[in-house]
């Protein structure tokens, strides 16, 4: 989902949101094509994929998932990507990433 908001300067701000179900077997199949080695080795595929999808929804198309969408974990609930911060939320077996925050 992409949400367009008006900020105080009257310019549009794009927000990206993505939801991933933990344990989705497709993540292991696509990880090598869309994630960096260190992102895969971190063991947080759901959060990485949800963040990359949220960034792509906010700033794509034309972005490469490996080259352009690098994910770094700042804390359990905060990810850095594209020079911005992205919030991670978990509920049951669902991971939601939204931002930038």
Model-derived segments and spans:
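Core catalytic alpha/beta fold that binds nucleotide/phospho-ligands
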Residues: 1-101
């Amino acid at each position: 989902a992409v949400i367009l908001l008006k900020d105080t300067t009257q310019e549009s701000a794009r927000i990206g949101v993505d939801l991933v179900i933990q344990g989705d077997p497709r993540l292991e199949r696509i990880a090598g094509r869309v994630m960096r080695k260190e992102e895969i080795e971190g063991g947080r595929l759901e959060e990485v994929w949800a963040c990359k999808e949220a960034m792509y929804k906010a700033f794509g198309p034309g972005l490469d998932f490996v080259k352009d969408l690098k994910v770094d974990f700042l804390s359990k609930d905060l990810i850095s990507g594209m020079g911005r911060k992205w919030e991670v939320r978990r509920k049951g077996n669902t991971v939601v990433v939204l931002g930038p925050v």
